[in-house]
């Protein structure tokens, strides 16, 4: 008798009782990704485990059932009285934004109503990709005539869940997208067209801002700036979610990449012997015409730092008493790969 409702009416002649069969229908839900290009084939996202409450009113106070999705985004089917219901997500699935919209749906007797919904994937709106610093000073200011501008980095994005700080390429995985970026005068690269040299299309938020999906990003320097040696280290940055359903996550940790100065050591010794001579002053003229004076230490050594690309000269300016100045000029060059040739 649970499928029937009894009604009682009264008049002057008699009491009237009748029974009507309740009108039932069914309801289920189909969940899809609002951005399948980002989520399909990416184990950081799953449509399984989303929970939607089914309510009698738009205020969503009287719940009559729950709908829970499987890995294909299909929910269980519930039987309810015919009428209008309001469906709202109470738990977002892995990697997706909680859908706060209230969805009205009408259930017709004897039929199954299917509500189709879409969830946005969580994204990380990265601003600064990386920053370069001088290894000696730990600052984003170059030494001498060196520059932090013009370094190039290859950035790769992998559709995969992080495994600690392991490079996905070591696991045989292929990057989904990759780009080459160039640093500005502050040694920074930003995820935008101004710093892009070449590469694939950017991932974008619904408002058009550049972003990364959940997964793994690797950063590697592929061209050093003037005056520095290339840093071969591959920096692995996991982009993860705590699955709280928030629209954006901020787990991209901008790497600070240290740069080692390109240097040339010069040692002044007594002719025919290995005796070092201290106090010898040299004039170094770099490829841009800038000059500096450097003096040998007690080991007869002087170090030229931050060598720019092009031709350089070294010439003795003065020597200690008892020594004769060498009139010769030493020339050396630095090529585009920061290789020194004497």
PLM regions: where:
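Solvent-exposed loop/turn and edge beta-strand elements of beta-rich ligand-binding domains
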Residues: 1-342
């Amino acid at each position: 008798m649970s499928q029937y409702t009894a009604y009682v009416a009264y008049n002057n002649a008699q009491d009237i009782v009748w029974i009507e069969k309740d009108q039932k229908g069914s309801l289920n839900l189909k969940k899809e990704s609002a951005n399948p290009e980002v989520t399909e084939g990416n184990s950081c996202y799953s449509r399984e485990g989303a929970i939607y409450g089914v309510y009698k009113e738009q205020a969503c106070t009287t719940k009559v059932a729950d709908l829970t999705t499987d890995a294909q985004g299909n929910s269980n089917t519930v039987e309810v009285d015919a009428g209008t219901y309001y469906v709202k997500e109470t738990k977002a699935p892995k990697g997706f934004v909680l859908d706060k919209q209230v969805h009205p749906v009408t259930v017709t007797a004897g039929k199954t109503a299917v509500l189709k919904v879409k969830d946005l994937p969580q994204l990380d709106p990265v601003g600064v990709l990386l920053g370069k610093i001088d290894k000696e000073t730990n600052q984003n200011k170059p030494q001498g005539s060196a520059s932090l501008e013009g370094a190039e980095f290859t950035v790769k994005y992998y559709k995969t869940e992080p495994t600690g700080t392991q490079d996905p390429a070591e696991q045989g995985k292929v990057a989904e997208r990759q780009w080459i970026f160039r640093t500005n005068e502050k040694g920074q690269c930003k995820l935008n067209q101004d710093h892009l040299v070449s590469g694939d299309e950017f991932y974008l938020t619904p408002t058009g801002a550049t972003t990364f999906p959940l997964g793994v990003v690797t950063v590697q320097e592929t061209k050093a700036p003037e005056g520095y040696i290339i840093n071969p280290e591959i920096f692995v940055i996991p982009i993860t979610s705590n699955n709280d359903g928030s629209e954006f996550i901020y787990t991209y940790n901008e790497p600070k990449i240290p740069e080692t100065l390109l240097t040339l050591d010069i040692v002044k010794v007594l002719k025919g012997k290995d005796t070092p001579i201290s106090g010898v002053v040299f004039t170094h003229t770099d490829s841009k015409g800038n000059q500096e004076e450097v003096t040998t230490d007690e080991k007869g050594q002087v170090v030229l730092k931050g060598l720019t690309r092009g031709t350089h000269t070294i010439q003795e300016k003065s020597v200690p008493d008892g020594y004769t100045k060498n009139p010769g000029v030493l020339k050396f060059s630095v090529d585009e790969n920061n290789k020194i040739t004497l």
